[in-house]
């Protein structure tokens, strides 16, 4: 077990706590320092006093303002242990603007390529749209940057092509906190890349004989870690100051090495302050001599830049350096210690059955501070291994006063890597399901589309970590899902508006309906353009109203004829169409039209006699031909049939009006076939997803939309579920798996019956809320 060892002394911690007393006053636990850290009270007070003391105006007007800006420029270089001899400082709006500036101005030459790491911020992906002048664009994995770059001492081909390649990666992943070893910077600059990565755009070709330049996205890293630019010399460094100081916002920087400056091409645009002169009557102009002035278009955000001085001073005052450690080194040790402690505690959270509560996402573990920062990403799982949506976690955390981040954190590539999403899964999430960045669409078929992230700053305390652990234990180890949902719904008014919308989706929904017009044949699914379906006093309209009988009048089922599942029904234009391969036949839906010239017959369903109308010779011949059995007939139920148990009205179903299946229970079977195919095996009318496997077995009553249902009991399964409903092939593992999971009992799904006797115009609709009573 990891014991927490504080980095700060008691007196230092007391001073820090005093700077952030608003957290205690507001009963808030702030755990999103990777989003932004918090500003100290004395910091903003000193910044305001500075504005009150001085006349700070446009730097083109006032020399004092220019001196302040130069002071900050010097302080930035000092903060990163470098000087103006080696780096230029260009002030930008933020790290994103810095990345954009590099993409727009980097000169790739004729054969240069753009390489970026998969686990990068969205802004790096945005660079691809600005580097169309590169020959090709390649995506690198972290391993291809660190493990597969050529080893030191090996020799790269001497550049022969007029090409410069740009490699962009994050010093610290803002999703997981993983740190790419910064030795990769010099290694790639000197030796190039052993493999270019996955080619995704442009011309694919040989790249090893280019000069290589490094663009380091340092926004997440420098917030809590020292970056020594004398030791590591990336060509471009992008950052946002609010990540470090919390205040001010709206100002970032691009640090450009002297080598990097030589790789910038001539600008296609200039703004105020970037030129010595520009003639209006000709195209002649002359850029400033100073490199940074050429790229700082217009008036700088000078008030924000001046405010950075107090950011540097406050940080050094609140977290003073020691004989051995500088300020940022101490902050790095502090946040890593908290993350290491939290990770260890999360690993110990177990459900009563021993299943882990937490799924962690990291690469290197938390033992080595040079490889892992103060970020912990995770998802919560149930005792059956199902995932809890991150939207629910966000709601529960907010109601406990905990501010954290959920989703993909503007890093879809890291999401893809850590969640194991291939291209098809990405399409299912973003194209077919319609998820967008920043929403709370957290689960698709039980699989997470994002994660929960907590991240630490120098003002984070061990108490904050314990509050998070307390919330997870009380909400996910000591309560049932229905209790948790009820708690959230009762307190929903206290949530921010964006989370209030998520509360509306916490309850399970009716995902899909299916009717089986012909008993034992394929389903007609209510989905897509068909969102709703009417109810009758027997169940869903047209469900199991027809059945096929043999020459002896006995009902034909898949137990005797598996090919029945290949007969596909289609209801349209007042007829029931039956399809088998390319062959089709139809019968009228209207019972009056059917009864006009039909003979009455009697058959049996579950030992009960049922009256039916013969549907005629044409459909009989069609069935016999396609199924290869003589004497088959299609009958339609005409007489009333009641349950022997409670006199409920039934169609040709075996036992109850409706059969409900929970997709979470289906997922627990873990078959290799597509989930939808496994769901189809159970031939249910109503498909929901509660997020908890076999939770439906505890239901007594439930409502779907406005319709109330009584649970009749579990469905006892036979070997018919071993039949693949798409192919008709048998596979015994379905039944054996259920038997194993249910301790020898063959139960899967539940029978339900509508409580209200009033039919009216009742209907069920996909998307209806499922409320367990």
Curated annotation (Swiss-Prot):
**Is Phosphoprotein there in the keyword field?**
yes
Where N6-(pyridoxal phosphate)lysine occurs, residue numbers?
A: 243
Known pathway: Cofactor biosynthesis; molybdopterin biosynthesis
UniProt xrefs under InterPro entries: Aminotrans_V_dom, MoCF_Sase_C, MoCo_sulfurase, MOCOS_middle, PyrdxlP-dep_Trfase, PyrdxlP-dep_Trfase_major, PyrdxlP-dep_Trfase_small, Pyrv_Knase-like_insert_dom_sf
- GO molecular function terms listed in the Swiss-Prot or TrEMBL record: lyase activity; molybdenum cofactor sulfurtransferase activity; molybdenum ion binding; pyridoxal phosphate binding
This chain's source organism reads Drosophila ananassae
What residues does the MOSC domain cover? 632-773
Sorted alphabetically, the keyword list is: Molybdenum cofactor biosynthesis, Phosphoprotein, Pyridoxal phosphate, Transferase
Mind telling me what this protein is named? Molybdenum cofactor sulfurase
Give residues where Phosphoserine occurs.
731
Q: Which gene encodes it?
A: mal
Q: Which residues are annotated as active site?
A: 410
User: What is the similarity comment for this entry?
Assistant: Belongs to the class-V pyridoxal-phosphate-dependent aminotransferase family. MOCOS subfamily.
């Amino acid at each position: 077990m990891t014991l927490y060892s504080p980095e700060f002394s008691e007196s230092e911690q007391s001073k820090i706590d005093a700077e952030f007393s608003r957290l205690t006053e507001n009963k808030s636990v702030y755990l999103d320092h990777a989003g932004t850290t918090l500003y100290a009270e004395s910091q903003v007070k000193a910044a305001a006093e500075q504005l009150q003391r001085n006349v700070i105006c446009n730097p083109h007007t006032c020399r004092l303002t220019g001196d302040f800006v130069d002071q900050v420029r010097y302080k930035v270089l000092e903060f990163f242990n470098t000087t103006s001899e080696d780096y230029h400082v260009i002030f930008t709006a933020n790290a994103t603007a810095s990345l954009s500036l590099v993409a727009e101005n980097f000169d790739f030459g004729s054969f240069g390529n753009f390489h970026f790491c998969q686990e990068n911020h969205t802004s790096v992906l945005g660079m691809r749209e600005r580097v169309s002048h590169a020959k090709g664009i390649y995506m690198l994995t972290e391993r291809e940057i660190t493990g597969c770059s050529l080893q030191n001492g090996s020799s790269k081909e001497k550049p022969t092509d007029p090409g410069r390649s740009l490699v962009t990666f994050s010093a610290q992943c803002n999703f997981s906190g993983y740190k790419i070893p910064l030795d990769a910077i010099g290694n790639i600059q000197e030796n190039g890349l052993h493999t270019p990565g996955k080619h995704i755009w442009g011309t694919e070709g040989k790249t090893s004989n280019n000069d290589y330049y490094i663009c380091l996205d340092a926004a997440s890293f420098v917030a809590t870690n020292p970056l020594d630019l004398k030791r590591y010399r990336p060509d471009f460094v992008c950052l946002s100051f609010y990540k470090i100081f919390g205040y001010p916002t709206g100002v970032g920087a691009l640090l450009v090495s002297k080598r990097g400056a030589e790789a910038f091409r001539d600008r296609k645009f200039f703004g105020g302050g970037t030129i010595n002169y520009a003639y209006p009557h000709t195209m002649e102009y002359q850029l400033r001599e100073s490199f940074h002035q050429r790229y700082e278009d217009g008036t700088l955000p000078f008030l924000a830049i001046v405010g950075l001085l107090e950011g540097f001073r406050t940080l050094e005052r609140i977290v003073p350096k020691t004989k051995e450690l500088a300020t940022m080194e101490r902050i790095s040790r502090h946040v890593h210690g908290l993350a290491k402690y939290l990770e260890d505690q999360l690993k110990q959270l177990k459900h009563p059955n021993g299943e882990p509560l937490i799924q962690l996402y990291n690469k290197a573990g938390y033992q080595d501070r040079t490889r892992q920062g103060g970020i912990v990403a995770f998802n919560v799982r149930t005792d059956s291994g199902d995932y809890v949506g991150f939207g629910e976690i966000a709601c529960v955390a907010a109601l406990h006063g905990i501010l954290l981040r959920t989703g993909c954190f503007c890093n879809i590539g890291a999401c893809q890597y850590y969640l194991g999403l291939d291209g098809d899964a990405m399409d299912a999430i973003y194209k077919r399901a319609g998820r967008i960045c920043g929403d709370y669409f957290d689960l698709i078929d039980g699989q997470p589309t994002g994660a929960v992230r907590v991240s630490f700053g120098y003002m984070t305390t061990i108490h904050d970590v314990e509050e998070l652990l307390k919330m997870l234990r009380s909400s996910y180890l000591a309560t049932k899902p229905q209790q948790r949902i009820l708690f959230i719904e009762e307190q929903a008014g206290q949530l921010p508006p964006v989370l209030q919308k998520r509360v509306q989706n916490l309850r399970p929904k009716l995902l899909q309906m299916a009717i089986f017009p012909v008993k034992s044949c394929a389903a007609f699914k209510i989905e897509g353009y068909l969102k709703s379906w009417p109810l009758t006093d027997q169940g869903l309209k047209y469900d199991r109203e027809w059945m096929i009988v043999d020459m002896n009048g006995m009902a034909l089922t898949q137990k005797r004829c598996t090919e029945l599942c290949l007969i596909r029904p289609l209801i349209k234009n007042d007829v029931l169409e039956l399809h088998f391969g390319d062959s089709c036949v139809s019968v009228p839906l209207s019972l009056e039209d059917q009864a006009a010239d039909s003979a009455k017959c009697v058959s049996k369903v579950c030992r009960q006699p049922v009256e039916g109308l013969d549907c005629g010779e044409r459909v009989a011949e069609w069935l016999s031909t396609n199924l290869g059995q003589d004497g088959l007939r299609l009958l339609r139920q005409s007489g009333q049939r009641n349950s022997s148990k409670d006199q409920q009205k039934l169609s040709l179903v075996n036992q109850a009006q409706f059969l409900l299946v929970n997709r979470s229970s289906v997922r627990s079977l873990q078959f290799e076939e597509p989930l939808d195919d496994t769901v189809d095996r159970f031939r249910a009318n109503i498909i929901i997803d509660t997020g908890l496997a076999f939770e439906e077995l505890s239901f007594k009553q439930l409502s779907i939309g406005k319709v109330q249902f009584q649970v009749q009991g579990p469905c006892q399964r036979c070997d018919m579920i071993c039949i693949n409903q798409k192919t008709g092939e048998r596979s015994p593992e379905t039944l054996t798996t259920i038997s194993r999971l249910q301790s020898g009992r063959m139960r899967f799904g539940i029978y339900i019956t509508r409580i209200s006797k009033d039919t009216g115009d009742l209907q069920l609709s996909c998307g209806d809320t499922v409320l367990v009573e």
